[in-house]
Amino acid sequence: MKDAYIIDAIRTPIGRYGGVLSPVRADDLGAVPMRALMERNSSVDWSQVDDLFYGCANQAGEDNRNVARMSALLAGLPVQVPGTTLNRLCGSGMDAIGNAARTIKAGEAGLMIAGGVESMSRAPFVMGKAEKAYSRSAEIHDTTIGWRFVNRQMKTQFGIDSMPETAENVAEQFNISREDQDAFALRSQQRTAAAMQAGRLAEEIVPVEVPRRKQEPLVVDTDEHPRASTTLEQLAKLPTPFREGGSVTAGNASGVNDGACALLLASPEQAERFALKPRARVVGMATAGVEPRIMGFGPAPASRKVLAQTGLTLEQMDVIELNEAFAAQALAVTRDLGLPDDAEHVNPNGGAIALGHPLGMSGARLVTTALHELERRQGRYALCTMCIGVGQGIALIIERL
């Protein structure tokens, strides 16, 4: 099979729910990093892009009707470039990269764009149609996150625990204490604050211009979600609203956020044709299923699966980017893999607890951050992994070139 090279990777800043990026539609937001790829790689004939895969978890609002294609057109890509939207919930952006790489490895494409977008701020309310005439039983659902239009059999067989409730389940099953969760959350905030102060995250960010009425556009070039002043004492005072006597709080969980990320992938032939310098190659990707009630544990079997498929070991990973949906599940996964709670190479620049978790974008963000970190420390391999709602995990390995 051919190699699938990562040529470039760029993302927008991550905005808070209702924050600086909330005025930007998902399709417009998704276009921003695509446009940046085009500007940064001017030697490419963009009409030669074979396909574009973009992850998006919602697709109930302005991100409907194939947001990947919409964003591609808005970015100025030639109309000949097709695009499709992938939905593996939280793993969508990573799945897009892995499937783009597989397409190149199979020889079916030579040039691909992959990534993801999510505007959780702009997620709409939806209402289903009544099952019979004159019914008064219509329900309105907030599509920002979680279950809607639940299948009764799913509820009976697997439960419909909310995402925080699944984290409570993980904390209980794997004996993850509130104190350990808060300590993990604090480390995430501290590492992100240090990375931002050193300018490390700025290297992977393209600014977003947010239109303003009767004013110049607001230029957003910094992640909005981190709270650098967080203390352990503050975290300890937060309530546990998801379960009586529980341990999951707003402080040791990821945020509800907005953002977009895009990567350019190429075969060896197309990289040479357009004078592109490969930065990494996608070694492999794997997915795994777990019980929906403990969905946060998904990265553990997915990571083992991709390591087995690629013939690599966890000890060979110079960087590990583990999505911090919740501190409870991140700790359950790292401990199951035999890693210390404060492993220096696991989320060295912090993670989703500090940075935020725009669902369809996050997987692509992990790969982008891992690539930049590998280059900084001159490492070889990075493992990127994350949990997925309804009980899945996904993991992807890249090798720096």
Name each model-derived stretch.
Residues 54, 168, 204, 212-214, ...:
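Active-site pocket-lining segment
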